[in-house]
């Protein structure tokens, strides 16, 4: 009884798929950045629900490899979209350090979806990896690489244009069928057409996303290789020490004209002094006193004494005359003796 109650409480496969699709539509219609926390939480929740739906689908074993899409029930066609939905949600996960791994996981989901829909003949398209392998194995196609690239680019451009037009037509038809199918008023034929158009729409999206993923993976790998190369170049390497170099012209010039200054020192001062002591006899103490000049004395000689006395007398006479002149000016004011206003 308890197991039956638990089974009844478990979400159904249809509910898991519809909730996952609803969360994906909310993420795509949101105005917030994809890397924001609310958006990332919705992406992870949707992936979790779709993973549960995939596990339940594998246990139910609804599809067979030998079937065609016409043999699948109309209500079961929508479950073929599970790998494509997981691939679209994986691309919306944010993580710069894990970006390469996320791209590889998303590519694997899209490849599983395309392989499954191609085997059921849901739409007429060619698998991208099968097309590239056939071109590589054709020797005639590889004879002229430049011409092959031009033809491939033109064909790829035309395919993208055609795919875009088909996608717009499918989306327009889906918008007209969506309300009737979701409300349960559509008959089995319209329900079948609606889910078949949904599968073809996701086929077009998956083909475009795989091309974009391949380009981004190539860019990331080139960036990583450049980073490793720059890191190896920047790592310090042991190098032999640089040897001094001598210009031949400078050596020849020095041999002819010398080193460029008066002389080069050939011995130290101590060596010169020792050599001088060996060649000459050092004078004795008495001879050194005789050769020494007489010491200067700062005492006043007898000849200079009269000169000093005479200079002092002259200074006293000059001072006496100046005093007499000052006294005369005091007794004789300015203009004294000029009685006739002369001068």
Swiss-Prot record:
Keywords: B-cell activation, Cytoplasm. Residues 304-316 have a biased composition (Acidic residues). Expressed selectively in brain and testis. The keyword Cytoplasm applies. Pfam families: TAP42 (PF04177). One of its GO terms (cellular component) is cytoplasm. GO terms for molecular function: phosphatase regulator activity. It is found in: Cytoplasm. InterPro entries: TAP42/TAP46-like_sf, TAP46-like. Residues 317-333 have a biased composition (Basic and acidic residues). One of its GO terms (biological process) is B cell activation. Residues 278-343 are annotated as: Disordered. Belongs to the IGBP1/TAP42 family. Associates with PP2A-alpha catalytic subunit. This is Immunoglobulin-binding protein 1b.
């Amino acid at each position: 009884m308890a197991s039956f109650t638990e089974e009844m409480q478990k979400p159904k496969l249809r509910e898991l798929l519809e909730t996952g699709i609803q969360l994906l539509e909310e993420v795509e219609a949101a105005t917030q950045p994809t890397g924001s926390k609310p958006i990332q939480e919705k992406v992870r929740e949707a992936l979790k629900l779709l993973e549960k739906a995939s596990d339940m689908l594998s246990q139910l074993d609804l599809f067979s490899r030998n079937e065609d899409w016409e043999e699948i029930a109309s209500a079961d066609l929508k479950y073929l979209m599970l790998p494509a939905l997981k691939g679209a949600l994986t691309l919306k996960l944010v993580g710069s350090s894990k970006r390469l791994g996320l791209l590889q996981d998303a590519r694997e989901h899209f490849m599983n979806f395309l392989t499954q829909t191609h085997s059921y003949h849901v739409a007429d398209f060619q698998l991208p990896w099968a097309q590239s392998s056939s071109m590589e194995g054709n020797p005639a196609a590889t004879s002229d690489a430049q011409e092959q690239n031009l033809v491939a680019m033109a064909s790829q451009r035309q395919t993208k244009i055609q795919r875009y037009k088909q996608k717009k037509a499918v989306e327009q038809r889906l918008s007209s069928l969506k309300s009737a199918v979701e409300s349960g008023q559509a008959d089995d034929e319209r329900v079948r057409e609606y889910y078949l158009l949904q599968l073809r729409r996701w086929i077009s999206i998956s083909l475009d996303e795989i091309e974009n993923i391949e380009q981004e993976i190539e860019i990331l790998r080139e960036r990583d290789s450049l980073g490793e190369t720059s890191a190896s170049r920047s790592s310090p390497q042991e190098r032999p020490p640089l040897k001094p170099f001598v210009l031949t012209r400078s050596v020849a010039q020095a041999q002819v004209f010398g080193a460029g200054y008066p002389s080069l020192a050939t011995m130290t001062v101590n060596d010169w002094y020792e050599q001088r002591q060996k060649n000459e006899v050092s004078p004795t103490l008495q001879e050194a006193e005789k050769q020494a000049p007489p010491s200067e004395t700062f005492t006043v000689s007898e000849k200079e004494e009269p000169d000093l006395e005479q200079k002092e007398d002259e200074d006293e006479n000059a001072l006496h005359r100046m005093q007499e002149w000052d006294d005369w000016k005091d007794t004789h004011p300015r203009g004294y003796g000029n009685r006739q206003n002369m001068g």
